[in-house]
């Protein structure tokens, strides 16, 4: 029998982890408390450093049975007055100061021991002799040869379970909660593998120590957050665009369509356009960490910037790529827009430009390039045959490149070596065609309901004009259908829709009988997730 939990007394934790970012918070709240990048940094660690951490962590064990110096025996009967007098006398002398200092040192050593113990448990990979770092502050801090890697692969499935466990622990620490005291709800993509589902289940019970667990589908949660039991969920994420039909709360898997031309494909298109459309005035995207100083310049003129050459030489390619992608992503969110009608060069030329300033001081009004890049979603054929470097580091400020990377930028063109198609390959189809293909793949009786309940979510769906363009194209391609697109105007609701749906679900009293309990996990193993979480 499944474990039954009361809805009123349980305060569940919700973690919604995507390829780009992960959201952590409490069930029943209307926004996540913590949003973290779904990446981790790692550097090598020596045996001596590991031994030092073990030495610090050992203090927690050795001191657990030791009475803290500040503790004293409780006064008995009428001795309270005498004890208070002695304490006052001692505090006024050197003995009191020494005792206070000793207690302070003891607490400091305990805190360090606890931190070292957690570092050894979550952050240190003894086999590969490396230490991991998670969180915005750690990933933004420059370290020589720090590598940055994604926790999830391009399909949104778990790539590094140890790094994800560390990310979850970091997020839960930010909430100041003990994971062993709260049920945990995790989310997953509709195409998640059996192996990945079992890894997540093991992580919840074995690593985090959760008393109960549930794995919910991200698309169903987005539909639930929109208040629709049946809908077509369009998720424009960082690496994938997917259209998923949901009828009465169940995914119709034969109607799932997805392509890898998501937000990062738009970033690649923007980067390509900048380097091929700006000319000599634009020398490259310069991340913040290499800038020593800069001066203001007029719009459209080259940046006047002094770089930290030791950081240019000392940064790894993955660290450089990560930070250049952050700059390009901010550029996209600030200026990118979708043309309201199918792509037309003349119409794009007449649209007004939008000002943007890069970290190195280069600024200008950007016009056609900010419109053309978003066509990756609707007209991917426009970008067929155009390659952009897989590593954003290939287009770092040209003047800062070490000689070994000089071939990456040659005469203003991006090298095709190690390149990937901007639009995710020739097989990609436009977003409107994906919607029609998904709906046509389901039963005829369900189609009208899906046309009238299209839910648009995902961080990259916030690009201006995307919803209007999709509505226009669907109206042209399916003129006899009543089409209604639900796209929340609230940024939080659209960007974090699956987390919000999970928050609502996990707070319902009727849901708590569905949790997988620790006892059930111990009896049936991780495979129970396939039977209980469908």
UniProtKB/Swiss-Prot annotation:
It comes from Mycosarcoma maydis. GO terms for molecular function: chromatin binding. Residues 59-116 are annotated as: Disordered. It is found in: Nucleus. The gene is ARP4. The lineage of its organism: Eukaryota, Fungi, Dikarya, Basidiomycota, Ustilaginomycotina. GO terms for biological process: chromatin remodeling; DNA repair; regulation of transcription by RNA polymerase II. Keywords: Activator, Chromatin regulator, DNA damage, DNA repair, Nucleus, Transcription, Transcription regulation. GO terms for cellular component: NuA4 histone acetyltransferase complex; SWI/SNF complex. Component of the NuA4 histone acetyltransferase complex, of the INO80 chromatin remodeling complex, and of the SWR1 chromatin remodeling complex. PROSITE patterns: ACTINS_2. Chromatin interaction component of the NuA4 histone acetyltransferase complex which is involved in transcriptional activation of selected genes principally by acetylation of nucleosomal histone H4 and H2A. The NuA4 complex is also involved in DNA repair. Is required for NuA4 complex integrity. Component of the SWR1 complex which mediates the ATP-dependent exchange of histone H2A for the H2A variant HZT1 leading to transcriptional regulation of selected genes by chromatin remodeling. Component of the INO80 complex which remodels chromatin by shifting nucleosomes and is involved in DNA repair. It comes from the Eukaryota. This is Actin-related protein 4. InterPro entries: Actin (IPR004000), Actin_CS (IPR004001), ATPase_NBD (IPR043129). CDD domains: ASKHA_NBD_Arp4_ACTL6-like. Pfam families: Actin (PF00022). Its main location: nucleus. Belongs to the actin family. ARP4 subfamily.
């Amino acid at each position: 029998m499944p474990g039954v939990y009361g809805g009123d007394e349980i305060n569940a934790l919700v973690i919604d982890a995507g390829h780009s970012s992960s959201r952590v918070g409490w069930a029943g709240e209307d926004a996540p408390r913590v949003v973290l990048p779904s990446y981790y940094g790692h550097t090598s660690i020596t045996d001596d450093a590991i031994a030092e951490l073990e030495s610090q962590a050992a203090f927690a064990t050795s001191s657990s049975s030791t009475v803290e110096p500040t503790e004293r025996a409780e006064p008995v009967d009428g001795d309270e007055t005498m004890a208070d007098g002695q304490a006052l006398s001692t505090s006024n002398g050197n003995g009191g100061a020494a005792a206070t200092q000793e207690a302070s040192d003891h607490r400091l050593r305990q805190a360090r021991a606890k931190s070292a113990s957690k570092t050894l448990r979550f952050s240190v990979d003894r086999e590969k002799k490396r230490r991991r770092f998670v969180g915005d502050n750690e990933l933004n801090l420059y370290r020589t040869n720090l590598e940055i890697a994604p926790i999830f692969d391009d399909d949104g499935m778990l790539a590094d379970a140890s790094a994800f466990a560390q990310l979850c622990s970091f997020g839960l620490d930010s909430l100041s909660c003990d994971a062993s005291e709260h049920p945990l709800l995790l989310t997953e993509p509709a195409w998640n593998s059996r192996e990945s589902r079992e890894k997540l289940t093991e992580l919840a019970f074995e690593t985090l120590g959760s008393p109960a667990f549930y794995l919910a589908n991200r698309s169903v949660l987005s539909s639930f957050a929109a208040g629709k039991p049946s809908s077509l969920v369009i998720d424009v994420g960082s690496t994938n665009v997917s259209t998923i039909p949901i009828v009465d709360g169940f995914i119709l898997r034969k109607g799932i369509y997805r392509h890898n031309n998501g937000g990062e494909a738009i970033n690649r298109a923007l980067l390509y356009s900048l380097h091929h459309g700006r000319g000599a005035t634009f020398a490259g995207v310069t991340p913040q960490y290499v800038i020593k100083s800069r001066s203001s310049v007029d719009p459209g003129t080259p940046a006047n910037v002094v770089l930290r050459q030791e950081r240019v030489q000392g940064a790894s390619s993955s660290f450089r790529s990560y930070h250049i992608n952050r700059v390009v992503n901010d550029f996209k969110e600030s200026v990118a827009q979708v043309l309201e009608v199918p792509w037309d060069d003349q119409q794009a030329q007449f649209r007004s430009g939008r000002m943007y300033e890069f970290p190195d001081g280069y600024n200008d009004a950007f016009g056609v390039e900010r419109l053309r890049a978003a066509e990756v979603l609707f007209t991917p054929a426009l970008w067929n045959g155009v390659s952009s470097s897989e590593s954003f580091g290939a287009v770092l400020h040209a003047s800062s490149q070490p000689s070994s990377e000089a071939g990456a930028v040659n005469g203003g063109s991006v090298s095709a070596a190690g390149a990937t198609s901007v639009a995710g390959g020739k097989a990609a189809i436009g977003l409107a065609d994906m919607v029609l293909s998904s709906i046509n793949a389901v039963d005829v009786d369900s189609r009208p309901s899906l046309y009238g309940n299209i839910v648009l979510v995902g961080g990259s769906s916030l690009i201006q004009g995307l919803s209007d363009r999709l509505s226009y194209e669907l109206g042209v391609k399916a003129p006899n259908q009543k089409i209604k697109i639900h796209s929340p105007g609230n940024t939080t609701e659209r960007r974090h829709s699956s987390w919000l749906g999970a928050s609502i679900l996990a707070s319902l009293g009727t849901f708590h009988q569905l949790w997988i309990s620790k006892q059930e996990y111990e009896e049936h193993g991780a495979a129970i997730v396939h039977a209980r979480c469908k």
